[in-house]
């Protein structure tokens, strides 16, 4: 009975495979939105004010960072929790594949969230005159919470690695 339960639990990791595939579909949706924004801005680039163009560019950078986060979670999560990716020897392989454990992934995700939050906060500050002060305050508080959380997670990771 114990062996059966262990085998079922071990096999259940494959339930995550469609979830990671779903993230690849989300990446496609993000890419479509990215290029929709490009196609929207290009015909009007000369009519846009510099600040408006910078806001659009920050949105594109934001989407790019989210896309990178999706790829990192998709591949690392699949390799850590489902199965090793079998990439042919002749094909290009990302140098971090197979080297990122769950803790490293968590720290990289936290750093990515801080970067994404920074870009979003910069976009908000670019339009600060149209944002109420209390909303601006909450954006800063939320961003600082992300920064503090990432710092604490990194510090705790460093402590646990140092003690082992």
Swiss-Prot record:
Family from the record: Belongs to the UPF0114 family.
The record describes its membrane topology as: Multi-pass membrane protein
Give any Pfam family that matches.
UPF0114
Keyword flag Calcium: no
Keywords, in A-Z order: Cell membrane, Membrane, Transmembrane, Transmembrane helix
Q: Which HAMAP family match?
A: UPF0114
InterPro entries under this entry? UPF0114 (IPR005134), UPF0114_bac (IPR020761)
Q: Enumerate the NCBIfam families for this protein.
A: HI0507
Instruction: Please state what the protein is called.
Output: UPF0114 protein YqhA
Q: Please tell me the species this chain comes from.
A: Salmonella typhi
- The organism's superkingdom is given as Bacteria
For this UniProt entry, which segments traverse the membrane? 10-32, 53-75, 136-155
Protein location = Cell membrane
| PANTHER family in the cross-refs | UPF0114 PROTEIN YQHA
**Cellular component GO terms, alphabetically?**
plasma membrane
């Amino acid at each position: 009975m114990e062996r059966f339960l262990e085998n079922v639990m071990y096999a259940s990791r494959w339930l995550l495979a469609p979830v990671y595939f779903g993230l690849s579909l989300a990446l496609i949706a993000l890419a479509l939105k990215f290029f929709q924004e490009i196609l929207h801005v290009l015909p009007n680039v000369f009519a846009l004010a510099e600040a408006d163009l910078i806001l659009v560019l920050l949105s594109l950078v934001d989407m790019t960072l989210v896309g990178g986060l999706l790829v990192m979670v998709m591949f690392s999560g699949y390799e850590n929790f489902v199965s090793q990716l079998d990439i042919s020897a002749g094909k290009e392989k990302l140098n971090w594949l197979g080297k990122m454990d769950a803790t490293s992934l968590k720290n990289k995700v936290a750093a990515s969230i801080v970067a994404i939050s920074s870009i979003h906060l910069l976009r908000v500050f670019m339009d600060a005159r149209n944002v109420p002060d209390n909303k601006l305050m909450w954006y800063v508080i939320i961003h600082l919470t992300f920064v503090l959380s990432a710092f604490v997670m990194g510090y705790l990771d460093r402590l646990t690695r140092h003690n082992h």
